């Protein structure tokens, strides 16, 4: 098997400083993995010509391309006129058409005679006698009835078009039902991850002027019951716009109910007739707000609208996951994040897929829970995050070896870049070296996947998201706005509007323009750095802030992290810059390891390992060992907080998405 080549010494590095502000590329990855002939023969997109035809049409004749796509893949109650009214930075797609994202996700399949197809397979966390205690399946016809009942209940509570509904629930079928019910009647859902604090819930309620909160009495997590309703009650003390609270009974624990405000799901929803039809809605009717953390200030409410988002979620799901009849698809994301919106609910359901939802932790009651689920439900497509893959590696191969994973035919990665070594473990241990891996790049703001291998045709390189999907026109520019060559990285921009693009930051037009559209004229600034190699493959090099300027050389932290993680005793690594009088910035690394001792010998070994993998320029100045890295609740490493730790500064910016303060507190104590 080919191996990654690497620069051996500082003589391989650029000799002069980088005046244009492009990023020096120092890590080389030349392993290439082709899909099997058997996989390609059955793939939805099975030839390079098919991809080129789609990509060329979308790039050169976008109106014609997207008109055909929208007419074929969405149901229209009333036809649209203009395909895209583009007045930078604002786009309107499928102007004056009327559709409904809930209809496209549910009713369309029932109307087509596929109502008996399984839509959702759900498994709760609790286990009794070695078996899951709670399991349910919903066909598309049953899902249609449940969603209609919920829509009727919401209407009874005074919710209508344009009203904002905050949803703070565990990963149960009712969460998907609530989202779809909002879409059915034109309400705007704002799903809040069930784990955020009361302060964070209130902040989101107030920013969106939410009228209703839907929650549950509690949820199960690692064998414990966590009270959700009590957290919501505290939030509602500071949420003056909220009029009602709809509560699902999940755990059966006590949940104080405030008369006149709080109502039970089983009283309001379950006894409804379930006959309410989906409401025809204008293409640009807001579908949902989803809050993401800002580096400073309050969280941003990313706004997506109905038709463009729905089409993008559906088509990207079909292209990337090669969906076929009979697949059991499992995206492990929570619906509190964009991945759950696009690839648990709207994308797969619009495509008529059978989706698995799991409520709990990946390591309860043991570290093999995911593989037990894959085996029992015969999951064929698995879409998970690099942070989960790294945890699986740390827990040990023996948990994987207990189970038959032969049902898997396709693997996916989402949330952040996956280090080549984690990619290789995923490929070998979970995929049995037969499953293509779709390493996807996209954002909350983009609505759906923007770059990914197409599994039937794209040779993959560990760590690369490969090529843009049809309709995505990327460009990479330096600090001066000039295009960069394949030897350098720069700011990743998108040059052409696409249907799934965000329509704004809710209630904050100035921030929307400043953050995404002010840097490069008429181009969407992703906030990520990237490079494009000579094969046209894209490599994400981290956030724009995740670049270190060492002696005039701009280095990607992702490449240094990948080198560290390639050491067999390193589980995870995060690299940041800290001020340095001579070099401008020094390289500071935070490392979690296996059982290896955290001594100077190991530090020096890791420094030499990076030097050998990349070169002297990228050798860390400082290496700090930690039991855990500070992460968001969606599993992303919060490098900006580590920058503050490395520099000895007070923490600044929004920390509401931080999962566990203890890891950060421990690092601060060591200063």
From Swiss-Prot:
Residues where CoA binds: 221-224, 339, 363, 551, 611
GO cellular component term, pick one: cytosol
Domain of life from the UniProt record: Bacteria
Keyword list, A-Z: Acetylation, ATP-binding, Ligase, Magnesium, Metal-binding, Nucleotide-binding
Catalysed transformations (reactions): acetate + ATP + CoA = acetyl-CoA + AMP + diphosphate
GO biological process, one term: acetyl-CoA biosynthetic process
GO molecular function: acetate-CoA ligase activity; AMP binding; ATP binding; metal ion binding
Modified residues (N6-acetyllysine): 636
EC number: 6.2.1.1
Function summary: Catalyzes the conversion of acetate into acetyl-CoA (AcCoA), an essential intermediate at the junction of anabolic and catabolic pathways. AcsA undergoes a two-step reaction. In the first half reaction, AcsA combines acetate with ATP to form acetyl-adenylate (AcAMP) intermediate. In the second half reaction, it can then transfer the acetyl group from AcAMP to the sulfhydryl group of CoA, forming the product AcCoA.
Name assigned to this protein: Acetyl-coenzyme A synthetase
Organism of origin: Rhodopirellula baltica (strain DSM 10527 / NCIMB 13988 / SH1)
């Amino acid at each position: 098997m080919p191996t990654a080549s690497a620069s051996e010494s500082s003589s391989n590095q650029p000799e002069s400083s980088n005046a244009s502000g492009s990023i020096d590329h120092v890590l080389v990855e030349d392993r290439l993995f082709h899909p099997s002939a058997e996989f390609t023969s059955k793939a939805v997109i099975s030839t390079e010509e098919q991809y080129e035809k789609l990509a060329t049409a979308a790039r050169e004749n976008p109106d014609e391309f997207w008109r055909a796509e929208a007419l074929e893949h969405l149901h229209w109650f009333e036809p649209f006129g203009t395909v895209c009214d583009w007045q930078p930075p604002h786009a309107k797609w499928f102007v004056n058409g009327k559709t409904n994202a809930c209809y496209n996700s549910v009713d369309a399949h029932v109307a087509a005679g596929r109502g008996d197809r399984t839509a959702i397979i759900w498994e709760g966390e609790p286990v009794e006698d070695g078996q899951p205690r709670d399991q349910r399946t919903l066909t598309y016809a049953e899902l249609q009835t449940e969603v209609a009942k919920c829509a009727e209940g919401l209407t009874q509570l005074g919710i209508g078009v344009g009203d904002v509904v905050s949803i703070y629930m565990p990963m149960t079928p009712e969460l998907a039902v609530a989202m779809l019910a909002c879409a059915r009647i034109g309400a705007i859902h704002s799903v809040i991850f069930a784990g955020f604090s009361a302060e964070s819930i209130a902040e989101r309620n107030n920013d969106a002027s939410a009228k209703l909160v839907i929650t549950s009495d509690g949820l199960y997590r690692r064998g414990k019951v966590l009270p959700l309703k009590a957290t919501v009650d505290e939030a509602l003390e500071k949420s003056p716009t909220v009029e009602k609270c709809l509560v699902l009974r999940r755990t059966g624990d006590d949940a104080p109910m405030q008369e006149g405000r709080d109502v039970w799901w089983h009283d309001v929803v379950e006894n409804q007739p379930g006959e309410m039809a989906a409401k025809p809605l204008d293409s640009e009717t807001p579908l949902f707000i989803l809050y993401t953390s800002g580096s400073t200030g309050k969280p941003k409410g990313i706004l997506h609208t109905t038709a463009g988002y729905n089409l993008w979620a559906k088509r990207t799901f079909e292209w990337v996951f090669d969906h076929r009849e009979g697949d059991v698809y499992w995206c492990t994301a929570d619906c509190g994040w964009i991945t759950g919106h696009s690839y648990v609910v709207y994308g797969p359901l619009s495509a008529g897929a059978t989706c698995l939802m799991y409520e709990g932790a990946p390591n309860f009651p043991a570290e093999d829970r995911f593989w037990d689920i894959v085996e029992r439900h015969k999951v064929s497509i698995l879409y998970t995050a690099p942070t989960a893959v790294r945890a699986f590696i740390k827990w040990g191969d023996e948990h994987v070896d207990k189970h038959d994973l032969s049902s898997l035919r396709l693997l996916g990665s989402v949330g952040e870049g996956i280090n080549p070594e984690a990619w290789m473990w995923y490929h070998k241990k979970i995929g049995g070296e037969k499953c293509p891996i779709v390493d996807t790049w996209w954002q909350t703001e983009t609505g759906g996947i923007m770059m990914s291998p197409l599994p039937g045709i794209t040779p993959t390189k560990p760590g690369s998201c490969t090529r843009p999907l049809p309709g995505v026109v990327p460009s990479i520019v330096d600090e001066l706005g000039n295009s960069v060559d394949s030897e350098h990285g720069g700011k990743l921009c998108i040059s052409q509007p696409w249907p799934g693009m965000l329509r704004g930051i809710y209630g904050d037009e100035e921030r929307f323009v400043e953050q995404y559209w002010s840097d490069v004229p008429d181009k969407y600034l992703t906030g990520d750095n990237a490079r494009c190699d000579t094969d046209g493959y894209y490599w994400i090099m981290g956030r724009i802030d995740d670049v270190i300027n060492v002696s005039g050389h701009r280095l990607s932290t992702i490449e240094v992290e990948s080198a560290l993680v390639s050491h067999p005793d390193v589980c995870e690594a995060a690299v940041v810059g800290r001020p340095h009088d001579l070099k401008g910035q020094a390289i500071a690394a935070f490392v979690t390891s296996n059982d290896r001792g955290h001594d100077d010998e190991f530090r020096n070994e890791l420094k030499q390992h990076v030097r050998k993998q990349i070169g002297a320029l990228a050798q860390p100045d400082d290496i700090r060992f930690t039991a855990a890295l500070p992460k968001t609740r969606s599993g992303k490493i919060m490098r900006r907080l580590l920058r503050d730790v490395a520099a000895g500064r007070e923490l600044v910016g929004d920390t509401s998405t931080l999962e566990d303060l203890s890891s950060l507190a421990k690092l601060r104590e060591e200063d």
